[in-house]
Amino acid sequence: VMPARTRLLMCQTIKGRPRTCSSGLGQVSVNGRMRSPRPAAKIIAFIYIAFRNKDNSKMLQHLFVRFLLLPLSLLYGFGVSIHRFLYLTEIIKPLKFSLPILSIGNLSVGGSGKTPHVEYLVHYLKNYVQVGVLSRGYNRKSTGFIWVEPYLKSDEAGDEPLQIKSKFPDVSVAVCESRVSGVSEMVAINPALQVILLDDAFQHRAIKPELDIILTTFQQPFYSDYLLPFGRLREWRNAYKRADVLIVSKCPERLTEEIRQDYLSKINPLPHQKVYFSSFKYGNPYHLFNPEIKWFPHQLPSVLLVTAIASVQYLEDYLKPRTSSLVHQVHEDHHYFTHYE
């Protein structure tokens, strides 16, 4: 039953006489004849009813805000196009170093799983060559070039570089806002380095890498996304053509060949490009205050999940069927936890 206020909005007047309205959205009774309400009245009624539902209200508010951001996306896209033009015409020329540089990045903002893939490459390469990792050190409070050491705090080195260093103590890890300055410093101080991984550097075109790797998530592939701030893309979709390798990350464990082919057809890779599909394999959880107590994934008790990452859906989907109760405390990406927290 439509609220009275909505019914009144659908009523019009003919020569001073009020029409009578039905309580539904479908038709309006006018002088005994049934007529469809005007499009504007339908829209008003739909919006009113939708906003009465909390879930629909949130969805509509989100869509409304996004459409308000559309002009900003066009303006942002204009800036991206100028930046691209400067490099395509070689008005700005990228620098190529003598040692191999591998760039790992993405087209969208956060949540694609770059850091685990960087760690995977470090784990593999360190057995064959002297490998180094250079990151901007997102959200750190320090500036300039810094060698990352395990005793540093996250606000000094950035949480992700610190995580990489803690897992691979023998690997050279550094942070610097300028990738050119950072690589130059690393090579000058440690000439034994044979390859450097640039974390999140696809948009930093001042360096010409030996290999450009980009990630896109299975749930939110770049080909169905839009430019910031309307969408999550940092560049136009066709920027993927600069990459040598594309990785579809966070895939389901059982990925059929039919789904693979569907994604490949939509990505439409160039002849020289390689496309891979990856998924995460989580380790067994252990007790926070007693690490010797471990659980197998199918034996989890009630869980309090505390996260400060860009995308939580993949982790939630993994944990929900493996625990009797999941309470999730969500913080923004790279959140600094206080002593109280």
Language model features: what each stretch is:
Residues 41-42:
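Short, small-residue-biased leader/transition segments that mark boundaries at the very start
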Residues 138-269:
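Phosphate/Mg2+-binding loops and adjacent switch elements
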Residues 75, 115, 164, 199, ...:
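Residue-level signal for inorganic ion chemistry
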Residues 53-100:
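A transmembrane-helix-recognition feature enriched in membrane-embedded lipid enzymes
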Residues 85-150, 253:
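Walker A (P-loop) phosphate-binding motif
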